[in-house]
Amino acid sequence: MMQSFIRGTSSRAVMEHEMQDLMDQDPPSFGVRKLCQKGWSIAEIDGSILNHDTHGFDSFISALAHHDQELMDELRKTLIGRGIQVPTMNGNQKFINLDNSASTRTFTPIWNTFRQTLPQSEPVKQEIIQEVKTICSDFLNAPLADYEVIFTSNTTEAINLAAENLSLESDNTIEPVVLNTLLEHSSNDLPWRMIPGCSVVRLSIDGEGFVDSNEMEGILKAYNQEGQFGKKRIRIVAVSGASNVLGVCNNLKEISRIAHCHGARLLVDGAQLVAHRKVALDDCGIDYFAFSAHKVYAPFGSGALVVKKDQLHFTPEEMEQIQISGEENAAGIAALGKALLLLKRIGMDRIEAEEQVLTRKVLTEMAQIPGLDIYGIKDPDSNRFSDKIGVIPFEIKNKIATQVGKELALIGGIGVRSGCHCAHITVKHILHVGPGLEKFQKLIVTLFPKLSLPGVVRISLGIENSEADIDRLILALGSITDKQNKSSKKEAKRLMNKFVDAMAEQIYQTV
């Protein structure tokens, strides 16, 4: 049945049939030789577990260029947890998730793929893992002839592997340096600090979060060409593909050009990038690319390091231990493969375009709320707006970030993230928290543990979000900034306890 989908037929009837087949929520029955017949492509053990015929697929997309929106709409209907009600000060309301940067929820086809993989035999699981490597390679434009795909548990483990790989370089004539930025998540900061004898230098960022390519070139030249710092040489430039705090996407192609021009390699923390933008490792000249499945609608404990083969310093025995030590998370890897296939079928250009519309709406309407300050790119008409994903950090005057997060939940049933977002360096920078103030804050928190350190509130969009979600957000923010509106903490606690008791009872009854 899926052959017509792969060949690229433009028949409207067939398209609707295949779309339903793709989204079917009923678990298929499968025998000894089949993984699934619905929701995935080809499932013969002796054939292709996950058909990734990109030529046929591209033909299909081309023929149905005006229907990718329908596929996205159908996918949204299968969101796990869609329509769940949560208690608020205004009664039960549908939960709105605006915390996609922390972790994305999943969809039924991806969930089905995960659970259908669990009972499979080891040979089938190994076939699936190899197929998903090809899917990752295709999705990221990282040819398997040149790149190795190493599955991990998350981005942090992937970057730890890259850091360990750097530590294996045997050149006693230099002291390795990693060039980082002020934008980095702890996953792309702490691993580099753990390398013996390695130091970290950070690039500054401007008011919107962008690095200065001239500063970068100057630092690389000073270290690698002029030898101004003795034996220290920058070996890796490690940057985020998209900031998890400010949402900005720096020019990876330009960063790669400068890095390679001065004898350094480029590692990209792609955790926040993969679900939002088209990525081309080969075209950009990226040497290492790390990402997590839970940021890309497959929250089942997998991730990957995609690395140029000529950059690996592990022995064949060490590589084998890395890849197959213990039992691999085949089901999580399969879910990742399914998620990437779905994103490609929808089209990353479509996903980016929709997200830009919502981001523009958020920025425009939040700018009208008194006492609310947005960090990073604020103006949707800025010429750099196109370099921003749907991540918007903000604060409300005279309110602690964690309190704003709680009030959004209580008033609107909206889930956001507040605090430092595992990017303390970035948040301290944008809030202008100097060393003296930081020490004072730590002392205060030690004396009064219930107090929260300064942070920002973060809204982060995903493909599940709609303009209606933004409307509810703006309404709730308006209510929070209205000084006349005072919610009762006692009533909020009562509602929450009632909700928890009801959910617990429901779970026990189900069991």
Could you describe each region identified by the protein language model?
Residues 2-511:
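Pyridoxal 5′-phosphate
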